[in-house]
Amino acid sequence: MAIVAELHALLQAADVPGPYVLAGHSIGGLVSRMYASTYPDEVIGMVVIDAYSEFLKPIFGPERWPRLVKFNAASSTVVPIPGYGDAETIPYASGDDHMRQLTATSPLRPMPLAVLAHGRPFDLPKDPVLSQGFTSKEIEPLLFKANKAQAELVPDARFFHAKESGHDIHQDQPALSVEAIRQVVAGVRSPDTWYELTSCCKTDDDHRADPNAAGPDH
């Protein structure tokens, strides 16, 4: 994926020394994951926020996967960013096969990893043609399972089910993303702080949500 090489070139050109803790949301999580496999010596911690998962395709299976790709192609909109009108967009699933090949040959090395997953269901069109026949009851457990599988990529990864957030967890509950990043950075600097964690993202005096929640039935 070209954007991974571009990010690497940008960090080098900007003289930002590694190694890095990467944080990525949605497709940005895919970029972070592929960066870590492409440049394994440069990444020592990651936070993936409701990220595109390498497990989506096998979990959705041969019947559902093409429907998911078509659904996202029809529903995705690109919001222009001032000054970046010519920026390229990444078609959904365009790098999936390459990603799974890369991650299979270059697994994620052990590191502090925090995985955040949305809890509020996506708003699906009521028109079955537009939704590709998906319902929240069908799709949400699969998305949850794909997110949860990311927390099994390395030993001692932390998983958090953000029940009060939609896909944009960093906007709906920004403190969760901030705390996850803080915990990963602290874990890189002092590994004992990571292994001693009893929860991801929540501070010691705030346990209103259960970090080990099983989420939707699946």
Predicted features along the sequence, with ranges:
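Conserved acidic catalytic loop of the alpha/beta-hydrolase fold
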Residues: 2-18
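Short beta-strand/loop motif that positions the catalytic acidic residue
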Residues: 115-117
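Catalytic active-site module of serine/aspartate enzymes centered on a nucleophile-bearing elbow/loop
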Residues: 155-218
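Conserved loop-alpha-helix segment in the C-terminal half of the alpha/beta-hydrolase fold
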Residues: 123, 127-165
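Active-site nucleophile elbow and catalytic-triad environment of alpha/beta-hydrolase enzymes
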Residues: 84-105, 140-149
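Conserved hydrolase catalytic core segment
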Residues: 17-60
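Short, hydrophobic alpha-helix immediately C-terminal to the catalytic nucleophile
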Residues: 8, 33-37, 178
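Flexible "cap/lid" loop of the alpha/beta hydrolase fold
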Residues: 47-91, 95, 130
